[in-house]
């Protein structure tokens, strides 16, 4: 059996946390031979801390062979101590009458604090995934607040958009999700994201040719994927928690264990690829190997794609401007 690794999860007693923790403890994220120590953070409010205790009781009651230990805390420095993986799930949701700029600032404070704590106490190789929205900008803030950690250690979750897009394309083309390769999502985790199946194949056959419906792409597919979160809230009365947790597991598993040459989507700090300014936390097609991701290079960006990529980039630049005074 391998040595246990430390997995920190914030917002651990929330809806996504509840869908996530049992799957991490069962080995779905890091493999069936990798013991884990869960380091769980919740806000310093009695109700949240009580809820966290209850979740930890349930984790105990599963008797997971891979769960080598557990701590619950309201202190980021305790939660992130020597963490090998950190899933930053907790964030402040948008309240009634709250402007997006206010939301960015409120979350900015949270992610500055968490970035600083990671900088101080986490493993120098910590892999950080930001799930809490606005995910790209929160990840950017955490990254900027942790100057002693490599920027590449910080990522944002675009995998939910990616998975949503996979299913829509599979249903339209009459193929199964497992056969689809080379789909990606560019940009921000928001309705401006650009899901792109121009290079996608199913069993080697081009999906763009198979679907061959530009109007569907523009008027049905992109809005459906972009607004899926809102559609789920409307249907369920609650936000998508299980599918978000599933996407977080997918993102971390692929980053840690590799994709065998398959493309996945990750929000990563840009290295200047495809004209995206360096440092912007942006969804790209990537492949992963030995715990490192690489942006897929050399893809042709046609006029429609450039428009959509610029549209989502502009939103990210606006978000970055709104919190510019908060980060160096």
Curated annotation (Swiss-Prot):
Residues annotated as binding substrate: 94, 100, 133, 164
Catalytic residues, chain numbering: 189
Top-level taxon of origin: Bacteria
Organism this protein belongs to: Acinetobacter baumannii (strain SDF)
Residues that bind NAD(+): 11-17, 107, 114, 131-133
Reported function: Catalyzes the reversible oxidation of malate to oxaloacetate.
Name of the gene: mdh
Protein name: Malate dehydrogenase
Cystine pairings recorded for this chain: none
Keywords, sorted A to Z: NAD, Oxidoreductase, Tricarboxylic acid cycle
EC number: 1.1.1.37
